Amino acid sequence: MKLWGGRFSKNTAALVDQFNASIEFDQKLYKYDIAGSVAHAKMLAHANIITKQESQLIVEGLQSILADIEAGKVEFQLELEDIHMNIETLLIDSIGEVGKKLHTARSRNDQVAVDIRLYLREEILEICELIKQLLITFTDIAEKHVDTIMPGYTHLQRAQAVTLGHHFMAYFQMFKRDHERLLDCYKRVNVMPLGAGALAGTTYATDRVFLAKELGFDAICENSLDAVSDRDFIIEFNNTASIIMMHLSRFCEELIIWNTAEFGFIEMDDAYSTGSSIMPQKKNPDLAELIRGKTGRVYGNQVNIMTMMKALPLAYNKDMQEDKIPLFDTVDNVKGCLEIFNEMIKSTTFKKENMKKATKEGFMNATDVADYLVKKGVPFRSAHEIVGKMVLHCVQTSKTIEDLTLDEFQNFSPTFTEDILEVIQIENCVASKISQGSTSPTNVLIMVNQARVFIEEVLS
């Protein structure tokens, strides 16, 4: 029998039960649903809506149900629609008529809203911890490779030499922002909707502040219509999750490229690579490719929820039942990708000699030659033109800038003196970057030390 069946003269069709039910996926919320119900039962007694004895009986019954679920003793019923009705039915079956008082001053509309918020705030903190571990890994690798020279790219064309440590600290900044965004999102997740009823509030003198304290919320939703219809916090989380996945995908794309024979910058560990069913020689970066692929899946979840919400009038609509699958999927994929990426990158071997060798081609010291002229008094645009002609000469004669003699330099400008031959050495080009945040080993080490302070003082 449906707990809402009094108004109906016949049972719903079996096909309707199957189509309407969400228990297949919202059972994931069982412990949050029970936590919300325990707090609600305590509040009902606190507000003298039910007796303390009744509240205690309900709380004990709910705790027993929680233990049974976690012991695998409960089989949820599809005909009961969702996790809320399943647990309430189990409670009534367990403690009798008193169990029917639990839903006083509550609707499934505010009940599911609090369940999702309880679930999501816990998951946000878990994702923050995974990002923290990744930031530690990035910092460790950056410190180890503070002076490992490699090509830096724009347009995927060799541009200027950088250090591998600098590259990792760039990603440190990206994921640091992700961590900050998650904590900011948490503020809007950690607001309590329970007590809003179906949409208009209740006629009972409930204490929503008591509920918020019981459940660890920072504040209550201030408008009952908004409380039950708001899914902004899910959309905001999914957007933040999409940015996290974008950052993972960007790094995975680089690793996939670096892992090719054409680049040869890295070798992925056998434990984090796969083979081919037909080509015996293959060693594929499948995990990086999967993370890149799952990024599109998370993006799709974001579009899913925004499209679902775009034309919904106030307040609750059944469409909103569909918010959970994309939310759960996003959470699971972000956590899984962060965890596997961290282990994969820790086990990766960086081929320092190949990276440095790649900086010998592509005229990656050309900007340094132009800067040299500027420091000697040549206007930058004039210096740019001089060095451009020098590069063209090198291309036409199959030379690098390092191959040029002092006489050849002076053919392009009399400003050049013998010290240019030291300036153009790639190690000196990297070391000469003295601006804050630049790629020199000295600056990268400063970044690493600042990162360690941030991890220790802010994230611990």
Swiss-Prot record:
One of its GO terms (molecular function) is argininosuccinate lyase activity. Keywords: Amino-acid biosynthesis, Arginine biosynthesis, Cytoplasm, Lyase. Its main location: cytoplasm. Pfam families: ASL_C2, Lyase_1. It catalyses: 2-(N(omega)-L-arginino)succinate = fumarate + L-arginine. It is found in: Cytoplasm. Its EC number is 4.3.2.1. One of its GO terms (biological process) is arginine biosynthetic process via ornithine. One of its GO terms (cellular component) is cytosol. Pathway: Amino-acid biosynthesis; L-arginine biosynthesis; L-arginine from L-ornithine and carbamoyl phosphate: step 3/3. Belongs to the lyase 1 family. Argininosuccinate lyase subfamily. PANTHER family: ARGININOSUCCINATE LYASE. HAMAP family: Arg_succ_lyase. This is Argininosuccinate lyase. It comes from Alkaliphilus metalliredigens (strain QYMF).
